Amino acid sequence: ASTVEALGKSIVAGQYPVGTSLPPEPQLCENFGVSRTVVRESIKSLVAKGLIVTGPKLGTRVLSEDQWNWFDPDVVSWLSQKRLSADFLRDLQELRRIVEPAAIRLAAERATTRELTSIEVAFSGMKNAVENGGDYVTHDLRFHQGLLQASGNRMLVQMSKVLGALLRTSFEISTAKKNGPAESLSMHREVLDAVIAREPDRAEAAILHLIDGAKQDIDLVLSSRRRIPYIGRPATPLRAL
């Protein structure tokens, strides 16, 4: 693991409590066997991610979770390896309910032929993974990111990139439900068909149905386990039916 990854994971895991200082630079160099330059660059990266703050009188102090950059893929990945909280998943589902329906309405009005083809390819990948085994989650992510990109709104297109890690986190858990991917295929098809038909109202209703179904799957997965699943590694590929 890189120095920034090792430090980031340690902070997210609570090894350095909020308000405490990281070890001094020479100690970090010794701990990780790296140069001062590497340590300084790692510190800069963690500052950019909102995990720590530095200053002449402050030193290098750990910030509270509300200061972290929740859209940073590394931060999300480190959080998932720590085991996610129920609050995190609630916030994520609420964010999806706010962003995706509005984006889908725009996609139904603006999607180009090329964008629709890209989403269709992603759906085919999902279907193939269900029927023949394979990486369902990656195709699922491409499907949803494709819909955001098809909105024709540059800010939503940018958001599709930063939402990637968050969406993957949601999909990793919801697809852990037995037969979950197979059951959701028809809902994904309904979303895509509504967008292709240029029917914003129908598309919005379909994506809400899909998001709420994913929430039920997540709740079911969580209720059957004492702790939220560990998803530090990619989801296990599906087996053929």
Predicted regions and their residues:
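Juxtamembrane/interface motifs at transmembrane-helix termini
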Residues: 2, 40, 136-140, 176-180, ...
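C-terminal effector-binding regulatory domain of bacterial HTH transcription factors
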Residues: 201-241
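Surface-exposed helix-capping loop/turn segments at secondary-structure junctions
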Residues: 17-19, 106-114, 200, 222-225
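Short linear motifs at protein or domain termini
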Residues: 1-98, 105, 225-228, 232, ...
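Conserved amphipathic alpha-helical segments that form helical-bundle/coiled-coil interaction surfaces
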Residues: 92-173, 184-193, 202-217
